[in-house]
Amino acid sequence: MIETMTRFISVPALVLCTLAACGSGASSAIPTAPGQPGKPGLGINASLQGRRPFPDDNAWNTPVDKASADPNSDALIASIGLTKGLHPDFGASYGGGPFGIPYVVVSGSTPGVSVTFDYADESDPGAYPIPVSAPIEGGSSSSGDRHVLVVDRDHWKLYELYAAYPVAGSVNWTAGSGAIFDLSSDALRPAGWTSADAAGLPIFPGLVRYDEVVEQGAVLHALRFTASHSRHAYVAPARHYASSDTSSNRPPMGMRVRLKGTFDVSAFPPSARVILQALKTYGMILADNGSDWYISGAPDTRWNDSELNTLKTVPGSAFEVVAMGTLVKN
């Protein structure tokens, strides 16, 4: 088992999205349940047209606003940071271009390619339908996590790679690890397995995406976030830990936090309110080691970074831990 896949990414400025399509944003009635979805588009940053990954009863899609708080919530939140602000780790422009974790939507006829894994014993074998145009997190010359996320809209499957590199002169790839998820199933990875993420979770379902925030006007799932220190333990839906720290006051992978219902979001711009409402209703799940309170999203030149930056004013003290299930420590 891979015990340490610690990934620290320092992506500066936080950015938040704009709801250009939401008019004045005078209405506070943000949807909290899915409507009738359409057929997802194709390409980089393609809209899913309201289609939500995984069944409605999946952990990512389960509302937690009425769930009990964990009895150790105060200590766990303090260990991440009471005064540190929320930080959207995505946006329209930083260092000459958009930043975040990109994705691409492909059709079911996209040819599969071979991927060679460093951690093959915890990676899913098989052909991965990675198009030539597939974006790499951080860009083709980056040295960071280099995630590659591919959604097959017709077979409704998700393919994810960590530390992905195209093989020169070939259509094939190498990667640190990889995972394939059936988006119509609740199946988890084997216990103790990593994925393209440290916690053994899928990445794509936890991203803040432009099509949801702006086109749909609602984010109807939990989000993905990171913390600089985690525990040598995990809780469902996570399947893997990435730390040797055994303190009960450190957050385990898979821990879910939510924005307190009493936190006033009325002064935030419309796009920020959509994201904050998602954090109240669905919360966010600890998925990797990284900068404290960084939430993940897809890069897009259409984001309004000024609006995204308003999220930085939300302190860690505004969150609480949702009651956790059984901790897995070995």
Where are these regions (language model features)?
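Bacterial N-terminal signal peptides that target proteins for export
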Residues: M1-P12
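Short, surface-exposed polybasic-aromatic patches that bind anionic ligands, especially phosphate groups
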Residues: I30-N330
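C-terminal motif of bacterial Sec signal peptides marking the signal peptidase cleavage site
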Residues: T18-A21
